[in-house]
Amino acid sequence: MINRGPKPLEVLKLVHRLGASCVLGNHERSFLKHLKKGSQSSDSFSKLKEEMGDHMPFWEEWLQSLPLFVSEGEETEPDSFLVVHAGLAPGISPQDTDPHILTNLRTWDPIDQRPGDENHPAWYTFYQKSRTIIFGHWAAGGVVMRPNAIGLDSGCVYGGSLTALSWPDRSLYQFPAQSIYYPPQ
């Protein structure tokens, strides 16, 4: 919601007004750290803080209230799912996982049992449970459709598409970006 488009405050207001369920992502965590430290490390964060004005404490509290993951159904039920911003460490419950992993993970090093680099396989290749994990965060990985993992990041911010998932039929809907909001790296 934050730091990947031209109107982050409007996005926050829309999500809040709709009462939408969402999870905390890496940019929201970074923004909260920015607020806590009072640093000036990010022009976009400083600008957003300024736009929030007197309502900044409200938005800070609301962002802090967002969960790191949302689950529906029991883990063994066929249509159960868990939504997380980035990924899960294989073999570790989300409740016991470092928030940095939940909001930043892309690849996994199976030897050292830790987040990997770009040469390691995607984390979801090691995920063996039946509950479907729905995630984003990795535009370069594109849309992923596996029996137990669905990746929805299709690079909208980079001029790709915005991808939505209908559950439980697993239908995908894509809408082309209206612009390139953030240049690809």
Whereabouts are the PLM-identified features?
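Active-site metal-binding loops of divalent metal-dependent hydrolases
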Residues: 1, 20, 27-28, 86-88, ...
